[in-house]
Curated annotation (Swiss-Prot):
Expressed at low level in somatic tissues and at high level in testis. One of its GO terms (cellular component) is centrosome. Keywords: DNA damage, DNA recombination, DNA repair, DNA-binding, Nucleus, Phosphoprotein. InterPro entries: DNA_recomb/repair_Rad51_C, P-loop_NTPase, RecA_ATP-bd, XRCC2. GO terms for molecular function: ATP binding; ATP-dependent DNA damage sensor activity; four-way junction DNA binding. This is DNA repair protein XRCC2. The modification Phosphoserine is found at residue 10. Involved in the homologous recombination repair (HRR) pathway of double-stranded DNA, thought to repair chromosomal fragmentation, translocations and deletions. Part of the RAD51 paralog protein complex BCDX2 which acts in the BRCA1-BRCA2-dependent HR pathway. Upon DNA damage, BCDX2 acts downstream of BRCA2 recruitment and upstream of RAD51 recruitment. BCDX2 binds predominantly to the intersection of the four duplex arms of the Holliday junction and to junction of replication forks.
């Protein structure tokens, strides 16, 4: 965080920071092809309207991480930052129960011990939380995945509190974006952050200061509205949607690698047991 901290960093902490992170290439083969496998320092944006399976996918990936290797998991730690106060522990436990061959209380406790939860109620609190993570990341080399659900929670609040100044509207999220990039790079993490579709496709009336259309996104309907600092650090964008039927449990996603501009489409169902790819 600061020069004083860096001078105090021990050799053990340095090794933990640089060498102790497990590979996440096998996180979800159904979602990430070999060439798009997540690597340390990658930042993924999960984008879409409410109710399109973004948080369910986060539960799925979290379960994959915290399950023991003997049960097909990666046996690594996850930090989940909830800004909507929508995190459903019972839902995650249900997903884990369906994946544990012996769903004992002890086995469940061991899985959940690998999960760290933080709650934030404002963009400033999110920024302060991120600033406080460095000591945790140094001391927990098995903590490999950082999740923020959702990064767009405070968009309208920040826009109002910033008045007519675009710089003030975006100031805190810009700092959060820059800090997230530094943390995932220096500590060799993987970041998944969700953003909600607040801007209607083709609508210009509610454009934010950083909103822009992306013709190369084709029919995905992505409309950037968060600060340019965030748009710059994202390496992969995954657009979620729901099939036409209002109560359909079938969802679709389009994954776009922003450097190569390659697109991949997937479909999945949300069952009681969690996400199932079609």
């Amino acid at each position: 965080m600061c020069s004083d901290f860096r001078r105090a960093e021990s050799g053990t902490e340095l090794l933990a920071r640089l060498e102790g992170r497990s590979s996440l290439k096998e996180l979800e083969p159904n979602l990430f092809a070999d060439e798009d496998s997540p690597v340390h320092g990658d930042i993924f944006e999960f984008h879409g309207p409410e109710g399109t399976g973004k948080t369910e996918m986060l539960y799925h990936l979290t379960a994959r991480c915290i399950l023991p290797k003997s049960e097909g998991g990666l046996q690594i730690e996850v930090l989940f930052i909830d800004t909507d106060y929508h995190f459903d522990m019972l839902r995650l436990v249900t997903v884990l129960e369906h994946r544990l061959s012996q769903s004992s209380e002890e086995a469940m406790k061991l899985c959940l011990a690998r999960l760290f939860l933080a709650y934030c109620s404002s963009s400033m609190q999110l920024l302060l939380t991120l600033h406080s993570l460095e000591a945790l990341l140094c001391s927990r080399p098995s903590l490999c995945l950082l999740i923020v659900d959702s990064l767009s929670s405070f968009y309208w609040i920040d826009r109002v509190s910033g008045g007519e100044s675009v710089a003030l509207q975006e100031s805190t999220l810009q700092k959060c974006s820059q800090l997230l990039e530094r943390l995932v790079t220096e500590y060799r993490l993987l970041l998944f952050a969700t953003t909600q579709s607040l801007m209607q496709k083709g609508s210009d009336s509610a454009d934010g200061p950083s909103s822009s259309k992306h013709p190369c996104d084709g029919d995905m309907g992505y409309r950037a509205y968060l600060c340019k600092a965030w748009q710059r650090v994202v390496k992969h964008r995954v657009i979620f949607s729901r099939d036409d039927e209002a109560k359909s449990s079938r969802f679709s996603l389009v994954s776009r690698h922003l450097k190569s501009n390659s697109l991949k489409k997937h479909s999945f169902m949300v069952r009681e047991s969690g996400v199932e790819f079609c």
